[in-house]
């Protein structure tokens, strides 16, 4: 994979997808914890935001969700939360932002990105949430 990361198009696609998956997982997991903490079922949450219960079940499933920002904002609001953006820490900016903007990384950085990606993917699988 480190060799593939030398290709600017692959690098941008890989980093973009990695950040997308990690961010969605983080947001969805936080919303699911808030839902559980509030004692809400998925069906009750769906009623609160006037959507089909399948929308909420899909959001909290272990499959690779791709929710809209609107859905995430509505779910967050129903749980007394809001979505916010925060700057990346310096080490993540170096590993993600700079390569995205430049379209290139050094061989050492490519190896490190590949190593971190493998480690994150092993540990970031969301467990299926009971219905």
Residue ranges and their predicted role:
Residues 86-96:
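Short amphipathic recognition helices of helix-turn-helix/homeodomain-type DNA-binding modules
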Residues 1-29, 94-131:
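N-terminal flexible/basic segments that precede or flank functional cores
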């Amino acid at each position: 994979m480190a060799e593939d990361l030398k290709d600017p198009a692959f690098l941008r696609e890989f980093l973009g997808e990695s950040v997308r998956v990690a961010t969605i997982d983080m947001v969805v997991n936080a919303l699911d914890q808030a839902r559980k903490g509030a004692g809400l079922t998925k069906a009750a949450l769906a009623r609160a935001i006037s959507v089909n219960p399948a929308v909420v079940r899909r959001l909290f499933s272990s499959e690779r969700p791709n929710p809209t920002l609107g859905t995430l904002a509505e779910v967050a609001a129903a749980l007394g939360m809001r979505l916010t953006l925060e700057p990346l820490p310096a080490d993540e900016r170096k590993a993600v932002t700079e390569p995205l903007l430049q379209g290139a990384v050094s061989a050492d950085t490519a190896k490190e990105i590949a190593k971190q990606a493998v480690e994150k993917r092993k540990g970031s699988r969301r467990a299926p949430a009971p219905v």
